[in-house]
Amino acid sequence: MSVSQAMRRLVAATVVAGSCAGPAQAAGGAPQDLPSVVPESAGVDSAPLVRLSEWLRHDRMDVRSLVVVKDGKIVFERYGDGLTRDNNYELYSVTKTITALLAGILDGEGKLGPSTKVAPLIAAARPDLASELADKQDIELRHLMSMSSGLRYTTREGTDPLYYDAPDRLRVAVTSRAAQPPGTHFDYIDVNPVLVGTAVSIAAQVPEDAFARQRLFEPLGFAHYRWSGADGTGAVAGGWGLRLRAVDMAKIGMLLLDNGRWNGRQIVPAGWIRQMTTPSPAADDYGYYCWIHHVVEHGTPEFGAMGFKGQFITVLPAQRAVVVMTSLLPTDGGLRDATYLNLYRRMVGDYILPALTPARPPVESAAATQALRDELARSRQTKGVPGTAAAFNDAPEI
């Protein structure tokens, strides 16, 4: 089958997928969630977690969900403003990490790889864009995923056609211009994941969101998920728009922690996970759509995903732990020092890590368990104050 024929099949599949899009359950008909346990039974001290929740509640931070997993078990699951486990949230750039995992699945099948030249692949599927892709022939998949493509794109705040009501997002993305040699300069721009998501769809011969459902979301037992923001062609963006429950975000963290394995099954090649979580030549804190040593200081190994306004999946390998947060926190500051990032750094460094690494083995007690239960109940009844303006996509859904 030619690439152009594959693209025609892909467009047809996109229409079909769009007609049945919506929240989904696991193949067995019910979500397969991680087990929940009393923190002390997993060697975790609940007292710092109670203090963390009290701080968030006292300062009325708009933290919608905060989940801590230790050794594959949920030890802390906090929701605000009446929200529950069933709610999903706009993940913003955490979506990019999912796209990298999908590329890894295709790498394991020999359909994509770090050195794949993306422009020729797209041009063969979209001949109408060949002229715009002519200056991008040397850009490889790894350059796009490490934000070192060398492309330059100027975003029009609030009205950019890459984000808002795009009739054909890919057509907008390819108008970016090659400004630096690929692999030499880090520049965090959102045309990169649009190109990667397109490559994933072409290589998989189904739309990216359908491939994600088949090869990642259903095997991990996701529920109540949605990939929003499709453009006029029906294609989702590879860098934003995915909505997941916090407990399903935690499963992504566990997949990364366990080198691509889930319940004994290799979902993503282990070698790909290692590449994702290894710094690229262009940035010592960024791999394949994965931040590295970005949250925790003092040399503690850590990597994960970060999204605008305070969406996080953080993996702590030494503690065999995963931390997840969804929020609407202040966005002032830069990519590496945003207020939401600094607040999250304090949460992890001052409260969560001490809970995971107590000075002495914690003792399970009825009093400690009740104190945690009471604080979580108070948190669910507390409405946080948004730290930044809420957009149309920021409302939690079910």
Regions from the PLM with identified roles:
Residues 334-398:
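Short, gly/Ser/Thr-rich active-site loops of penicillin-recognizing serine hydrolases
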Residues 11-21:
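Bacterial N-terminal signal peptides
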Residues 53-84, 313-314, 320-324:
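A short, well-structured edge-of-sheet supersecondary motif
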Residues 192-199, 240-261, 311-328:
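Active-site-proximal alpha-helical segments within enzyme catalytic domains
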Residues 274-326, 330:
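Active-site Gly/Thr loop motif
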Residues 72, 89-118, 144, 196-200, ...:
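Active-site SXXK
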Residues 47, 73-78, 117-120, 157-182, ...:
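Short, charged, amphipathic alpha-helices and their helix-cap/turn boundaries
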Residues 90, 109-151, 175, 204-240:
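Active-site helix/loop module of the DD-peptidase/beta-lactamase fold
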